């Protein structure tokens, strides 16, 4: 049984957490994030510590307790440090470019794939086989990174495709001759 919901969140210097109704707002050096939390969970800010209490003991409320605490903790971490995902393109002729607000992927299809970046996310392409996605919202960064990876997810025989940095691809052996 997890007890993440009972852990307190220590606020670093320069971070403010406020609540209006069910909307939690976190302000920090890198920006501001807002998120709606469930009315079944109450949040209290005492000095530089944030605590969460739940209204009951049924399974839904217990699940929301830990999830809400984790979401607010990710908001605090995002406005202080930010989040970053790095993707690698593996395959002959696979490359990426970033022009304007479009990420252009050449990954073996007949035409290049163009993806528009979300407003909350920053994209860098240091070399044509590496894509760095960063931002203060963990959800937005992870969702966009997953969208990019889904364009050509790694295949198990040669490992070609778009993968996360440090992702291990389970390789299959090909067919053997008679």
Swiss-Prot record:
Keywords: Ribonucleoprotein, Ribosomal protein, RNA-binding, rRNA-binding. One of its GO terms (cellular component) is cytosolic large ribosomal subunit. InterPro entries: Ribosomal_uL6-like, Ribosomal_uL6-like_a/b-dom_sf, Ribosomal_uL6_a/b-dom, Ribosomal_uL6_bac-type, Ribosomal_uL6_CS. The keyword NADP does not apply. It comes from the Bacteria. One of its GO terms (molecular function) is rRNA binding. Coiled coil: none annotated. One of its GO terms (biological process) is cytoplasmic translation. Gene3D superfamilies: Ribosomal protein L6, alpha-beta domain. PROSITE patterns: RIBOSOMAL_L6_1 (PS00525). Part of the 50S ribosomal subunit. PANTHER family: 60S/50S RIBOSOMAL PROTEIN L6/L9, LARGE RIBOSOMAL SUBUNIT PROTEIN UL6M. This protein binds to the 23S rRNA, and is important in its secondary structure. It is located near the subunit interface in the base of the L7/L12 stalk, and near the tRNA binding site of the peptidyltransferase center. Belongs to the universal ribosomal protein uL6 family. NCBIfam families: L6_bact (TIGR03654). This is Large ribosomal subunit protein uL6.
């Amino acid at each position: 049984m997890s007890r993440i919901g009972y852990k307190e969140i220590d606020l670093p210097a320069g971070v403010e957490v406020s609540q209006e109704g069910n909307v939690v707002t976190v302000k920090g050096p890198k920006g501001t994030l807002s998120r709606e939390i469930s009315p079944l969970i109450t949040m209290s800010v005492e000095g530089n510590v944030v605590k969460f209490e739940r209204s009951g003991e049924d399974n839904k409320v217990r699940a929301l307790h830990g999830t809400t605490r984790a979401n607010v903790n990710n908001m605090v971490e995002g406005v202080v440090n930010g989040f970053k995902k790095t993707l690698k393109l593996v395959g002959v002729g696979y490359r990426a470019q970033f022009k304007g607000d479009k990420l252009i992927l050449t990954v073996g299809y007949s035409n290049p794939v163009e993806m528009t970046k979300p407003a909350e996310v920053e994209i860098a392409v240091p070399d044509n086989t590496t894509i760095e996605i960063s931002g203060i919202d963990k959800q937005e960064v992870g969702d966009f990174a997953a969208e990019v990876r889904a364009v050509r997810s790694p295949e198990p025989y040669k490992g070609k495709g778009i993968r996360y940095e440090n992702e291990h691809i389970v390789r299959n052996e090909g067919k053997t001759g008679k």
